[in-house]
From Swiss-Prot:
This is Equilibrative nucleoside transporter 3. The gene is SLC29A3. The modification Phosphoserine is found at S21, S23. The chain crosses the membrane at residues 54-74, 106-126, 135-155, 162-182, 202-222, 231-251, 306-326, 340-357, 377-397, 415-435, 454-474. Residues 1-53, 127-134, 183-201, 252-305, 358-376, 436-453 are cytoplasmic. Signal peptide: none annotated. Contains a N-terminal dileucine motif (DE)XXXL(LI) important for endosomal/lysosomal and mitochondrial subcellular localization. It comes from Bos taurus (Bovine). Glycans are attached at N84. Keywords: Cell membrane, Endosome, Glycoprotein, Lysosome, Membrane, Mitochondrion, Phosphoprotein, Transmembrane, Transmembrane helix, Transport.
Length: 474
């Protein structure tokens, strides 16, 4: 191993960089395909006893998205709370009627804009603010926001509905931003761990969506008071966020996690020695960077361009279809009046089925990682998912203003298509996300994880924006 003078290094809060006049050669980087499966002889890698680290990352994945999912799932609650703005008394002029009519649009803006801004902010904070501070601060703010929303559930807001709307949108914006910082920070941290831990975090996010869909179905079946069910939703989120704080504080106490969270030795990639995938994140030499506090964005973008395209396009197609198109596909036997074809059709065939299929696709990557990060099959499969757009459009989407043809005359088709949409999204997006931090020098793993989540956010924003146009064309 090459010896480097301390004078050649620049230290930051999370990583150690050395100024270099030229970037590292491709064959000198720790590429995923060439990584060894065992640690160097001088280090003994602890075992993940009882899969404790895996379970913690899985739980953090749930906690990162469960509050947001519950926030969005409580549609009936928002209608109940905001209906006073849109239902004036007899003889009165409608006041602020757009609050209820366009509430979901306001919610989407309050969700996406802060997410993109906070992703960029988090990249700049990677080496300025310790990850422990970022994670705990974001979790604490998320918990505080949900405590406020939980308290307001049983408060009569009929006399100040407009103020309640303002508070709700503000809380959603803060929640979305802090959730983004939390998720991208933890995902960046898993870049220094073996891939199964990144997979656990991503699968946990899908489990959060599945749990919220199940909760929504239970609420429909029980038909309880809307405020009671929402109170149960929000209290569950409060408890889980508090649990996530405890789990994150527990993480460094596990030998296995501590092994990967602490740098062990300064090193340079020499081309003759490759650090194994299962070795801890070392204090390494980074490609040239003029600011030791800011990770070099250029090399990260260069190495992750292909994977970034896959992530953006995968989530673009997914958010183009789900939920805007999926939720408007009706059962062909809707006229029968059965609960399956009316009350439960969309919650079952759209939300629960998609989230469960997405979870299954993500979980499969724990055992199978094909195709690889350099394979042309990965972007090819991402592009192939474009076929889902016409498949869903020609199901029984209603109402139809321009395209009146319904080709798929059975309820089996939307069930099949939604399952394939979720499976392909879960499997392919997880592969692309977990590959990213593994194809760059190890000291850039955390920053690369943040960039990968930015790709995901960009795809979601583009898809959501274009879904409105697609709905208009139908």
């Amino acid at each position: 191993m090459a010896i480097i003078s301390e004078d050649d290094f620049r230290h930051t809060s999370n990583s150690t960089y050395r100024t270099a006049s030229s970037s590292l050669r491709a064959d000198q980087e720790a590429l995923l395909e060439k990584l060894l499966d065992r640690p160097p002889p001088s280090l003994q890698r602890p075992e993940d006893r009882f899969n404790g680290t895996y379970i913690i990352f899985f739980s953090l994945g749930i906690g990162g998205l469960l509050p947001w999912n519950f926030f969005v799932t409580a549609q009936e609650y928002w209608i109940f709370k905001l209906s006073n703005c849109s239902s004036p008394a007899a003889g009165e002029e409608p006041k602020d009627s757009d609050i209820l009519n366009y509430f979901e649009s306001y919610l989407a803006v309050a969700s996406t804009v802060p997410s993109v801004l906070c992703l960029a902010l988090n990249f700049l904070l990677v080496n300025r603010v310790p990850i422990r501070v970022r994670v705990l601060a974001s979790l604490t703010v998320m918990l505080a926001i949900f405590i406020v929303m939980t308290v307001l559930v049983k408060v009569d807001t009929s006399s100040w509905t407009h103020s309640f709307f303002t508070i709700t949108i503000t809380c959603m914006a803060i929640l979305s931003g802090t959730s983004t910082i939390f998720n991208s920070s933890v995902f960046g941290m898993t870049g220094s761990f073996p891939m199964r831990n990144s997979q656990a975090l991503i699968s946990g996010g899908a489990m959060g969506g599945t749990l919220s869909a199940v909760a929504s179905l239970v609420d429909l079946a029980v038909a309880s008071d809307v405020t009671d069910s929402t109170l149960a939703f929000f209290l569950t989120a409060d408890i889980f966020l508090a649990l996530c704080i405890g789990l994150y504080l527990l993480l460094p106490r596990l030998d296995y996690a501590r092994y990967y969270m602490k740098p062990v030795w300064p090193t340079v990639f020499s081309g003759e020695e490759q650090l194994p995938q299962d070795s801890p994140s070392p204090t390494s030499v980074a490609p040239g960077s003029s600011d030791p506090q800011t990770p070099p964005l250029g090399p990260i973008l260069k190495k992750t361009t292909g994977l970034g395209f896959c992530i953006i396009y995968l989530f673009f197609i997914t958010s183009l279809i789900f939920p805007a198109i999926c939720t408007n596909i009706e059962s062909l036997s809707k006229g029968s009046g059965s609960p399956w074809s009316t009350k439960f059709f969309v919650p079952l065939t759209t939300f629960l089925l998609y989230n469960f299929a997405d979870l299954c696709g993500r979980q499969v990557t724990a055992w199978i990682q094909v195709p690889g990060p350099r394979s042309k099959a990965l972007p090819g499969l991402a592009l192939l998912r474009t076929c889902f757009v016409p498949l869903f459009v020609f199901c029984n989407y209603q109402p139809r203003g321009h395209l009146h043809t319904v080709l798929f005359q059975s309820d089996v088709y939307p069930v099949l298509f939604t399952s394939l949409l979720g499976l392909s999204n879960g499997y392919l997006s997880t592969l692309a996300l977990i590959y990213g931090p593994k194809i760059v020098p190890r000291e850039l793993a955390e920053a690369t994880g943040v960039v990968m989540t930015f790709y995901m956010g960009l795809g979601l924003v583009l898809g959501s924006a274009c879904s409105a146009l697609l709905v208009h064309l139908i």
